[in-house]
């Protein structure tokens, strides 16, 4: 079996029983289970959810996305070996740590396979909850152009690139395109202030005003938990994106939870600590791949300018990246995952067949 066979690239064609369209995202695919299968699993497995709660199978792929495009490698290597397993292992570790420390639950009910979660359907809060401890990336680019206010927060003059900020900044952006909210542009991923969210509590899908305080608290506490844990491995937690949503427990009580993924190289920037102390930035996240793309293509504006999306999609479609680049990403993801979980990561030899076998034999979900 060659390297490409060990990579799960297409994850929306599994024979999982569903009566709804499969939702296929950039990296994950979601299979909504039938009412009968959801109810059966809740009863048989003892999940702490209402008896009629909708459940889904979430399958992560090894695809690599950046700048809103999915990128492919040469020699048929159209994903990054071990990437999906690494992302899920990291999220599983942090979600468990959050729960153990009394922060909040996640949407994950069961983990049948390293690439698979069984999740409870959540009502998502419509913000990307971003926390920044250092000024870098898009924030630094805006700062160099003279911007000093970010999401309603004014930051001081005289900051330098990659400098630690005076305090952890919460700089949320919209999740999807929100319409009819005064003062909020109708575009995906636009920055919003705390006052914007307070003016449109329901528009951002919060149940009540007090939950804005709660999400900020959970974001800060979650950031600190991950930052402290990574520091033990001499890694710097630079910035991250969390997502939140609402679910009901078995007693019918609504609760705000963490969802999607947390503290991964896809959703966060992580720097090597010793290199940072020497004034060098060694990326331990997808940011290294983003920087490689910016340096690789002569007209990097295509990757940064949202008015050139058609050109960007064509760039990703028509260029096969060197296998060495895909393997460098693999080494980064697997390496940081093994630091986080404290053990060797087991990479599937034949992931698609393994998933089908487990979901058939242990969950009776294969048609």
Swiss-Prot record:
GO BP of this protein: 'de novo' IMP biosynthetic process
Pathway: Purine metabolism; IMP biosynthesis via de novo pathway; 5-amino-1-(5-phospho-D-ribosyl)imidazole-4-carboxamide from 5-amino-1-(5-phospho-D-ribosyl)imidazole-4-carboxylate: step 1/2
Protein biosynthesis found in the keyword field: no
Enzyme class: ligase
Recorded catalytic activity of this chain's protein: 5-amino-1-(5-phospho-D-ribosyl)imidazole-4-carboxylate + L-aspartate + ATP = (2S)-2-[5-amino-1-(5-phospho-beta-D-ribosyl)imidazole-4-carboxamido]succinate + ADP + phosphate + 2 H(+)
Entry EC no(s): 6.3.2.6
Taxonomy, superkingdom: Bacteria
Keyword list, A-Z: ATP-binding, Ligase, Nucleotide-binding, Purine biosynthesis
GO MF term set: ATP binding; phosphoribosylaminoimidazolesuccinocarboxamide synthase activity
One GO location term (cellular component): cytoplasm
SUPFAM superfamilies tied to this protein: SAICAR synthase-like
Keyword field contains GTP-binding: no
CDD domains cross-referenced by the UniProt entry: SAICAR_synt_Sc
NCBIfam families in UniProt: PRK13960.1 (NF010567), purC_vibrio (TIGR02735)
Family: Belongs to the SAICAR synthetase family.
Protein name listed in UniProt: Phosphoribosylaminoimidazole-succinocarboxamide synthase
Organism: Shewanella halifaxensis (strain HAW-EB4)
Gene: purC
């Amino acid at each position: 079996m060659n390297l490409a066979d060990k990579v799960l690239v297409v994850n929306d064609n599994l024979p999982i029983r569903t009566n709804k369209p499969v939702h296929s995202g950039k990296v994950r695919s979601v299979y909504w289970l039938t009412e009968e299968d959801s109810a059966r699993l809740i009863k048989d497995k003892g999940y702490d959810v209402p008896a009629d709660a909708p459940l889904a199978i979430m399958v992560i792929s090894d695809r690599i996305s950046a700048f809103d495009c999915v990128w492919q490698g040469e020699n048929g290597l159209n994903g990054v070996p071990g990437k999906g397993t690494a992302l899920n292992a990291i999220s599983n570790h942090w979600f468990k740590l959050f729960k153990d420390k009394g922060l909040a639950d996640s949407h994950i009910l069961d983990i049948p396979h390293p690439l698979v979660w069984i999740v409870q359907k959540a009502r998502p809060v419509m913000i990307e909850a971003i926390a920044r401890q250092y000024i870098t990336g898009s924030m630094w680019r805006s700062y160099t152009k003279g911007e000093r206010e970010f999401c309603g927060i004014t930051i001081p003059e005289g900051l330098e690139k990659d400098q630690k900020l005076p305090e952890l900044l919460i700089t949320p952006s919209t999740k999807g395109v929100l319409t009819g909210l005064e003062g909020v542009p109708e575009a995906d991923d636009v920055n919003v202030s705390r006052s914007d969210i307070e003016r449109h509590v329901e528009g951002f899908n919060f149940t009540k005003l007090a939950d804005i305080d709660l999400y900020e608290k959970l974001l800060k506490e979650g950031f600190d938990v991950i930052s402290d844990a990574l520091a033990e491995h001499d890694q710097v937690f630079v910035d991250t994106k969390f997502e939140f949503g609402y679910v009901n427990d078995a007693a019918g009580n609504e609760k705000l939870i963490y969802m999607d993924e947390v503290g991964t190289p896809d959703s966060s920037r992580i720097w090597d600590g010793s290199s940072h102390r020497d004034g060098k930035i060694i990326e331990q996240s997808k940011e290294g791949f983003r920087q490689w793309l910016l340096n690789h293509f002569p007209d990097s504006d295509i990757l940064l300018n949202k008015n050139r999306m058609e050109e960007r999609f064509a760039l990703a479609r028509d260029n096969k990246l060197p296998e060495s680049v895909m393997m460098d990403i693999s080494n980064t993801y697997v390496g940081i995952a093994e630091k986080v979980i404290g053990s060797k990561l087991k990479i599937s030899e034949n992931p698609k067949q393994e998933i089908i076998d487990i979901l058939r034999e242990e969950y009776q979900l294969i048609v």
